[in-house]
UniProtKB/Swiss-Prot annotation:
Its EC number is 2.5.1.19. Pathway: Metabolic intermediate biosynthesis; chorismate biosynthesis. It is found in: Cytoplasm. It is an enzyme of class 2 (transferase). It catalyses: 3-phosphoshikimate + phosphoenolpyruvate = 5-O-(1-carboxyvinyl)-3-phosphoshikimate + phosphate. Keywords: Amino-acid biosynthesis, Aromatic amino acid biosynthesis, Cytoplasm, Transferase. This is 3-phosphoshikimate 1-carboxyvinyltransferase. 3-phosphoshikimate binds at residues 21-22, 26, 166-168, 194, 324, 351.
Amino acid sequence: MNLKVKTISNIGGEVKAPPSKSYSHRAVILASLADGTSKIHDMLFSQDVLSSINVCRALGANITKKDDYLEVIGTNGKLHNSSEVPIDLGNSGTTLRLMTSIASLADNEVILTGDDSLQTRPMEILTESLASLGVCAASINGNGKAPILIKPGYVGGETNILGNVSSQFISSILISAPLSENGVDLFVLPEFKSRPYVNMTCDIMAKFGVKIENEFFVRHDDCDRESKNCRIDEFKISKQEYKSCDYVVEGDYSSASYLLAAVAIYGGNAKILNLFKDSKQGDKLILNILKKMGAKIEIFDDYVEISSEGNLKGIDVDLSNAPDLLITVAILAALADGTTNITGVKHARVKETDRIATTCSELKKLGCKLKEFEDGMSIEGGIRSGVVDSHKDHRLAMAFSLVGLKHDIEIKNGEVFDVSFPNFIEAMSEIGVELELI
């Protein structure tokens, strides 16, 4: 189906940001590993998160959706694969990466697979790092990608992993580490990208009762301790158990970026609820980006207010710790005056699509002048109406719909927003943007 803007009324009002996808994944997974019954409130039930729920059920967790929370009766780390066929994770790269380590805790073999897109995601860096911990996880097709066969056994010990490919590899090892036989000492080699996502993992692990020691050192005595290229992070996780708890999922700054950007682009005033001032989410960076581009932002304990005249200016921005903002910022840049330089997002090339390449190719269809680089792009403001393709990437579909605030736009395969933001159309309507699928 194609997504387009139907009508626009005065932009503004009040809308609640959807629950965090990242925290929802982690909450159901940790609750499934915990001893006892957990209640997860404000859970996001998107396609990706449902993939995590389904695999946790297959491995032994008892998960029930109640009226206003998700009840999870945990396994206390004692997993058993009840599925007689490969477990299909759909398009959820987060689920695949997080569960590859965890599946080794089962007492029988597990095969994790997914759709065609998921089967293009590189997994070799994770499986090689796990091998040093006594985990046998291998690509069935021998290409380093899903389907992944994971055999029982997780000894633990010491390993290292590159920090510049996917923070989910790091989170995967961290989450599974307390349930290994001997604990884990993990070294993250520079450059450590998307660090806030790992901070989120450590944060929620603490909520479920697990302690992590984190320190860092530099490669050589004469290295600059502030240099990202010299710093090696060490995470020490002893053998422990997860404890059940009641957990409330906070709002998602990634998804809220589309609501905030809509107000910034068109002009207006809005209050976005459920966005927490002390959040560890890296995508909170969107607030600083919009400020620099010309919007007025006020941050309160649990909501954000934005006002804008609709006149934005180009900026320079490093998205190394917030790669999921790439497409939103690219659209803001295309609708702003001047030039915007986006850097630090080489790791966005291994998302649902090569997001640097697909964003650039679709912007060019709209007459945008830009230059593509290995780790980002330079965009000159100026864009026209047209038709683009989402490449079945949920973030591309939602971000490009923002073009419709200024120009006619139609996005092919636009229905894929269900992956992360099921009520995207309804939320946009609450601030005055009527979208339709045709």
